Amino acid sequence: MKNSFLPSGLALSLFSLAMQAHAAGGHHAVDDAALLDVGKCKVEGWVERETGGARTLQHAGAGCRVGPVELGLNLDKEKQTTLDAATSFGPQIKWAFSLNDVLSVGAVASAKFNSQAPRYASSTLVLPLSWRATDTLSAHINWGRNFLRGGVGQPRGGVSFEWAPISDLSLVAERFREAANNSTRIGARYALTPDVKLDISRARGLHAGGVSWWTAGVIWEFDR
């Protein structure tokens, strides 16, 4: 009788390859259904600037793979010309599972707290799905909801396509819904080294009077 079970080391390697095939994340609104490798951590940061300078956002985040999930912590500082700077922070947990060599699903839950009262601001649940169409093209779909303080909820989600014409460069296009507004984004990610990636993108709101903004960021992965 033919043995249908893969050796554990080979199975783990195939699982890791399938998960690595999906690579969005970072500052992009549409998340991927992928986790850090076992034993890996990351730190990331990015800066957003609205065209005309009416709004800026500084983000710092860190995360580590812990068993079957990825645990993270986010810190944001947002400044608008007519308001004082607002600082928020919150934890995040992410789970992902490879259905086969081209499809992965997951779940991401996070919470946001203000540095000043009222502390609790919102929580979010997102269900990502990633599909590796070819060796160079991937698609990501998100369904989710924001649960705002006071019981008000907002749907969120989107779809993105990621194309890697060469091994060190990927191009991303996405359409997404956040904070009751629809927006689009195009961007590029360059791998400076296997563990350090640089991001740049431009996004634009699709609603009447929608503004545009630029984002530049960096992601560094390292062994724990």
Features from the language model and the residues they span:
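Cleavable N-terminal export/targeting peptides
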Residues: 1-27, 224
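Transmembrane beta-barrel domains of Gram-negative outer membranes and organellar outer membranes
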Residues: 22-224
